[in-house]
Amino acid sequence: MDTTKIKLISFDLWETLIFDSKNHNQRNKLRINSLRLLFDKFGQNISDEKILESLSFISKNCSQDHNSGFDKKTDIRIKELLNFLDIKKDNKLFEKEILNALDSSFLKHPPSIFPTAIKILNSLKNRYSLCLTSNTGITSPNIYRKYLNEVGIFDKFDKLYLSNELLVSKPSFSIFKIILDDFKLKPDEIIHIGDNLFTDIFGAKKCGFGTVFINKRNSVNNNLKIYPDYTVKDISKIPDLFL
C-alpha cells in the first residue's frame, strides 16, 4: 500500500505500546488480597484459590467476548465474577468496592511502556493524527485514561477507543467503522498497528484499513490466512515506514 496517503495511525495498546512485566504477578497478588479482605468485610468467606479462579474466569470471558467482537461494561464483569463465586448479594456499594479494588491494583502495579514508545508517538504526531484502539479487560476506562496520562502518552492521541466503553471490540468491523466516521477519512487513509493477527490485522483489513503487524514472536500462523501490509519486529521500526 501507499503510505503517502495515510492521515491517521491507529495503535493497539497491549503488547504494542505497553507490556506486562513482573508487575503482573504483583498485581494479581494485590487483587486477591484486596478482594479477600473485601469479601470478609461483607461476610463472604472466599479462599484465595477461588478468588484467583474467578479472576481467571473473567479474563477468559473477556478474551472470548473480544474475539466475538463485543465487550461489556465493568459493572457487568463484576456481576459475572460474583455469579462465578456464587455470591448472591445485590449490593451496589459492594460491587463498586470490588471494582475500585481491582482498579487500584492496576494503578499500584501497572504495565510497563516500551522504552521507545513516547519518542515514536511524538515524532508521528507531528505529521499524522493518532488514535488508540484497544480491547480492554476488567479495568475501568477512566483508570486506563489515568494510567495513560501517568506514563505520558494520553495526550499523544486525538481519540481513544476502549472496548469496554464502546461495547464493541476488535476484530469487529464496528469499532473500526467508528474510527472511520469520527475522523471522516477514507479507509486507505488510515493504518492500524497491532500485535494480534486476528483482532488487529484481520479486524482492520475488514474495514479497508492498512495494517502493520508487530511480530515480536517472529512467527505468523499461516492457518489464519491473514496477511498484513507490513510486518515489523517491534514499534522501534515504525518510523522507517512513515517518516
Which role fits each region the language model picked out?
Residues 112, 127, 139:
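Residue-level signal for short amphipathic helical patches enriched in basic/charged
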Residues 127-128, 208:
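Glycine-centered short loops/turns at secondary-structure junctions
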Residues 14, 124-125:
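Glycine-rich phosphate/diphosphate-binding loops that line cofactor/substrate pockets in enzymes
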Residues 3-115, 119:
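N-terminal helical cap/lid subdomain that shapes the substrate entry/recognition surface
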Residues 1-9, 19-21, 26, 42-49, ...:
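Asp-based, Mg2+/Mn2+-dependent phosphohydrolase catalytic module
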